[in-house]
């Protein structure tokens, strides 16, 4: 069963960063507001109300279509998708069906076996339903309340072909797509629930299972990994994989059966009678795209001389790329190393975004590193103190202030030499071992000097200096 190919396709629902809803003038700034206070007769579907299309949402969707190399249809139309669910107050959703806004695009990712083209089947506009609030655990709630503030928020749904071959590839695709949408300025990934994924997964030759409403990038990889294992185990026991819809319980890292999988005819699609077809041919040429992640990555390599791996990391999000360009002026290579290899690790550990690090303080820290005022170890300590202050809601000290307060400046050459002589006098057994050819003794002696200077010397330089002094004594 291990050799059965994994086949994955994704349906990604992205909330567009507009100020008003898809078909009415209600504000989209509904988070942290009282339930059911951002509604009107249109988004509640009350009798006699008439929808009107949000022009900005169409422009945003066209941008996404062009960025993903799609064919833009000259004419598309809205349809009603009919089904009953508590958070769907009209008992139908206005979406697009057989005439989507854009289709047949592609997105290049770093796949499991090198660069890979993932085909985009279609991109269409639709409205978000309301939000069900389960009182209790998600899969065993005592009862459910419904908040319609989210009903009518503009969405684009991006549907891929089943081109992904592992949960890891699926996450890579989502990361690349998220970055692209951020660069287009049509999507805010930091807003709760702004991206939700339905994942279709099967093992070659078996039925397809849909895992619905996964709300995080990590969650997609976890849900798909669980499903691969579950389906392989079923087949190994001689059982069949049932075609069904499943729900991902993120807290437990498992999927649970929800219902049998619907067919398209279950939704009884028909054209939305209250909206005219969209004719966008005259708009498409006027849509200008900004610099996208791949182009910025190539520019970072050519303009700043950073490595391809660092360039890929630094262009993985719009805010991160802008942060790097803000701090890179003095020494681009040093800034790339410390942003990609040190800062991001500390931010991820604290579940912080790049906004948590004041760029002026990071520039000052880079200056101290470049001028050889502090060691890398001290620089990491300063970085952590700054981020811990931010976490505690305090104003962080400037790096130079921290250096002065904690005495983190590098120990001078004369001081290091004096400390080496002290260690040589104190550690005769280790000296004898060194002269006997036991090179690990040198590492021990370096460690003793580092203790004396409290880590405020460069270990590489110290190793060389100590070896020179010992070799002269032979």
UniProtKB/Swiss-Prot annotation:
Pfam families assigned to the protein according to its UniProt record, in alphabetical order: GatB_N (PF02934), GatB_Yqey (PF02637)
Reactions catalysed: L-glutamyl-tRNA(Gln) + L-glutamine + ATP + H2O = L-glutaminyl-tRNA(Gln) + L-glutamate + ADP + phosphate + H(+); L-aspartyl-tRNA(Asn) + L-glutamine + ATP + H2O = L-asparaginyl-tRNA(Asn) + L-glutamate + ADP + phosphate + 2 H(+)
One function term, GO molecular function aspect: glutaminyl-tRNA synthase (glutamine-hydrolyzing) activity
GO biological process: glutaminyl-tRNAGln biosynthesis via transamidation; translation
EC annotation from Swiss-Prot or TrEMBL: 6.3.5.-
Subunit structure, interactors included: Heterotrimer of A, B and C subunits.
Protein name per UniProt: Aspartyl/glutamyl-tRNA(Asn/Gln) amidotransferase subunit B
Originating species: Methanospirillum hungatei JF-1 (strain ATCC 27890 / DSM 864 / NBRC 100397 / JF-1)
């Amino acid at each position: 069963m291990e050799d059965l190919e994994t086949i994955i396709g994704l349906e990604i629902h992205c909330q567009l960063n507009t100020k008003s809803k898809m078909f009415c003038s209600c504000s989209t700034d509904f988070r942290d507001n009282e339930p059911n206070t951002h509604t009107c007769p249109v988004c509640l579907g009350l009798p006699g109300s008439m929808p009107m299309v949000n022009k900005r949402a169409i422009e945003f969707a066209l941008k996404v279509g062009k960025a993903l190399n799609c064919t833009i249809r000259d004419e598309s139309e809205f349809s009603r998708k009919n089904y009953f669910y508590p958070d769907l107050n009209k008992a139908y959703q206005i979406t697009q069906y057989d005439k989507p806004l854009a289709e047949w695009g592609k997105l290049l990712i770093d796949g499991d076996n090198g660069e890979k083209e993932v085909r985009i089947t279609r991109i269409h506009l639709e409205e978000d339903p309301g939000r069900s609030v389960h009182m209790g655990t998600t899969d065993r709630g005592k009862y459910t309340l419904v908040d319609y503030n989210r009903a009518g928020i503009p969405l684009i749904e991006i549907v891929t072909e089943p081109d992904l071959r592992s949960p890891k590839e699926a996450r890579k695709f989502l990361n690349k797509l998220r970055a692209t949408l951020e660069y287009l300025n049509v999507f805010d990934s930091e807003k709760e629930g702004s991206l939700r994924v339905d994942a279709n997964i099967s093992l070659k030759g078996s039925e397809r299972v849909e895992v619905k409403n996964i709300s995080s990038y990590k969650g997609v990889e976890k849900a798909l990994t669980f499903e691969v294992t579950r389906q392989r185990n079923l087949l190994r026991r001689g059982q069949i994989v049932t075609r069904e819809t499943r729900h991902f319980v993120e807290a437990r890292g498992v999927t649970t059966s929800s219902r049998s999988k619907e067919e398209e005819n279950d939704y009884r699609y028909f054209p939305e009678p209250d909206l005219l077809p969209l004719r966008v041919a005259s708009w498409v040429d006027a849509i200008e795209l900004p610099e996208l992640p791949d182009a910025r990555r190539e520019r970072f390599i050519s303009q700043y001389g950073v490595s391809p791996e660092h360039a890929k990391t630094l262009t993985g999000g719009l805010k991160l790329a802008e942060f790097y360009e803000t701090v890179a002026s003095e020494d681009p290579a040093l800034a790339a190393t410390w942003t990609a290899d040190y800062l991001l690790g500390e931010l991820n550990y604290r579940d912080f975004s790049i906004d948590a690090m004041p760029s002026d303080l990071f520039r000052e820290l880079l200056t101290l590193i470049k001028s050889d005022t502090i060691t890398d170890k001290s620089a990491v300590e300063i970085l952590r103190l700054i981020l811990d202050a931010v976490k505690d809601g305090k104003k962080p000290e400037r790096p130079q202030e921290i250096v002065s307060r904690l005495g983190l400046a590098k120990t001078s050459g004369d001081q290091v030499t004096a400390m080496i002589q002290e260690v040589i006098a104190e550690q005769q057994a280790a000296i004898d071992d060194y002269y006997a050819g036991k090179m690990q003794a040198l590492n021990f002696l370096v460690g003793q000097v580092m203790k004396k200077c409290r880590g405020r010397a460069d270990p590489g330089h110290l190793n060389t200096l100590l070896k020179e002094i010992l070799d002269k004594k032979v």
